[in-house]
Amino acid sequence: MEEATDEEVQCLLPLVSAQRREQALRYKHTFGQFCCLKSWLLLQQLIGEVEDFEYNEHGKPFLPNGPFFSISHCKEGIAVAIDDHPIGIDIEAIRHADDDLIARTMNELEQSKIKNQKSKIESDREFARLWTQKEAIVKAQGVGIQSFEQLQTIIDNRKSNIETFEKEKYIYSIAYGKLCSISAKVQTTEL
């Protein structure tokens, strides 16, 4: 789904807290509002009634009484991860990544890894894999993406706390703390 109607958003608004309604309506476009609401409803489905959240100094929302959670959405789907320890998730569609975007968001090693793939689709897949890993890491750390260019994604997942998965036309990555396992609950849904 790449669009949502005002009617769909209006149907979802009564199903979430006043705080989440306010957050959703801050999105300029209807589709952003829709994704914000649907992702919160998916979180509610996983953990039950969701209390109002607070924000850390970098703007990351958290539940004062736990659990830790992370939400991501793109035009193709929504992903939610929860755990007893800090966790980050990102989901992205596999799509064309232009050279300018690659240069702005990837370090030299990552750029080389992307460009050395056997085909353009494999390069796009590798870009999505690295992008979601970076995004998941900054979400797990709760620091936001202001440090994106400096972040060194560890390519060898056997030595890192990052798991990356591909499902149909999108890739999602989960970054989790040293003390937690990958037993976190993860739910994805297509829009």
Residue ranges of model-derived segments:
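Core catalytic alpha/beta fold that binds nucleotide/phospho-ligands
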Residues: 1-191
